[in-house]
A protein has these predicted regions:
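A short helix->loop->beta-strand "cap" motif at the edges of active sites that frequently abuts
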Residues: 89-99, 140
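Extracellular/periplasmic catalytic domains that process cell-envelope and extracellular macromolecules
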Residues: 56-59, 93, 136-137, 173
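General small-molecule cofactor/ligand-binding pocket signal
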Residues: 29-31, 99, 141-143
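Conserved SGNH/GDSL esterase-like catalytic core that processes O-acyl groups on lipids
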Residues: 2-6, 10-85
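Alpha-helical scaffolding segments of alpha/beta enzyme cores, especially the outer helices
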Residues: 79-93, 122, 126-133
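Alpha-helical structural signal in soluble globular domains
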Residues: 19-23, 90, 130-138
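Catalytic His-Asp segment of secreted/periplasmic serine-dependent ester chemistry enzymes
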Residues: 108-112, 116-190
C-alpha cells in the first residue's frame, strides 16, 4: 500500500508520516511545506504544487491524505472547498482514494487563539462542519482528527508549546485516526 500526504507542518510534525507507515504497513510519502494551503498543492506553478502534480501523475497511490492550513476552512472557505474539489479530481484520476485530514482548533486558552479573538468551541465546530461538508460534496473519506482533539483536549496534552501544532501524543492520535480510516476502508473492500 502507498499513501501520499499533502499538507504542511501539521502533517510533518513529530514524524507523522513514519508513524502512519508503522500503523498501516504502507509506504508513506509526504509533499508538504510549513504554512502550505491546499491551493498551493493544486497550483503547479509553485514548487510544492509541481511536486504534487508530478507525484499524482507519475506514481501510483492507494490513498492521498489532504490537510488544509490550520484555519483555512474558516478564513478562506472558497479556496478550501475549490482546492479539495480540484485535488480530489486529480487523486481519483490517479486511481487513489482521497482522505480529508480534518484538523483541530488551536488550544483552548492558548495565546494564538486568544490573539485572534476566537472562541475555541466555535472554531472547533466551524472546522468540523467545513471538513464534513467538503467530504460529503466530494465523496471522500474523512479522518476527523479535530473531533478527537476536541474530545480529549481536557484530559491529555495534545498540543506543542505554541498551542497550535500537535505534541508527540497529538501526532500519535493523528496517525491512529488516519490509520483507522484506512484500515476500515480496506476491510470494507474484502
Amino acid at each position: 500500500m502507498r499513501i501520499l500526504m499533502l499538507g504542511n507542518s501539521f502533517t510533518t510534525a513529530n514524524n507523522l508520516p513514519q508513524a502512519l507507515a508503522s500503523l498501516t504497513g504502507a509506504e508513506v510519502v509526504c509533499c508538504a511545506r510549513g504554512g502550505a494551503r491546499l491551493s498551493e498543492q493544486l497550483n503547479s506553478n509553485t514548487r510544492l504544487g509541481s511536486q504534487t502534480r508530478a507525484a499524482l501523475q507519475n506514481e501510483e497511490w492507494d490513498y492521498v491524505v489532504l490537510q488544509e492550513m490550520s484555519h483555512g476552512p474558516i478564513t478562506a472557505p472558497r479556496s478550501f472547498f475549490s482546492s479539495v474539489e480540484g485535488l480530489c479530481r486529480q487523486i481519483r484520476a490517479n486511481g487513489a482514494v482521497p482522505i480529508l485530514f480534518a484538523t483541530w482548533a488551536y488550544q483552548r486558552g492558548g495565546a494564538k487563539l486568544t490573539a485572534k479573538g476566537w472562541d475555541y468551541n466555535e472554531v472547533a465546530r466551524t472546522l468540523s462542519e467545513a471538513y464534513h461538508k467538503a467530504a460529503r460534496e466530494n465523496n471522500t473519506l474523512i479522518a476527523d482528527v479535530g473531533r478527537r482533539f476536541y474530545e480529549l483536549a481536557g484530559t491529555r496534552n495534545l498540543y506543542a508549546a505554541d498551542g497550535v501544532h500537535p505534541s508527540e501524543l497529538g501526532s500519535h492520535i493523528v496517525a491512529e485516526t488516519i490509520a483507522s480510516v484506512i484500515n476500515q476502508h480496506e476491510e470494507a473492500k474484502l
